[in-house]
Amino acid sequence: MAKQAHITMQGGGKVVIDLFDQDAPNTVANFEKLANSGFYNGLTFHRVIPGFVAQGGCPNGSGTGGPGYQINCEINPNKHERGTLAMAHAGRNTGGSQFYICYAPQPHLDGVHTVFGKVVKGMEFVDEFKGRDVMESVQIVEV
C-alpha cells in the first residue's frame, strides 16, 4: 500500500502528499514517526519564499531546531519540481525534522536534498502561505 501525508492547516485547508517510501524509505519512516508522535502538530512553515520553497518542521520556529538526532540523505532520481516534498538540512546527512515544499522547479537542489514526496492535492493552500502558517496536524495514511 502507498502512503500519504495529510497536513491540515490551522484555519482550514489540507495538503495531501504522496510519499516516496520506495525511493527514500528511511526518510519516509522518520517523517511518519515524527508525524505519528504529534511532533509537527502546532509547528509552522517558518520560511516561505515565493517562487522557491515553503519550509517547516522546526520546533524552534526559526530553522535552527530539529528532533534531537540526524538522518542520512537518501539521494534518488526524483526531481525538485512544483509540489516536491524534500528534507531540509545544513549539510549532507544532517536532516532531521525540517522539510520543504517547492513552489517551482529547483534543479540546483537535485541530487543534494532527499526528495520524499509530491503534493497531489491542496497546492493552492501552499501557494497562499505568508509565513508562520501553522500545521494543526500531520497524519500519515495508507491508501
Identify the function of each model-found stretch.
Residues M1-V143:
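Cyclophilin-like peptidyl-prolyl cis-trans isomerases
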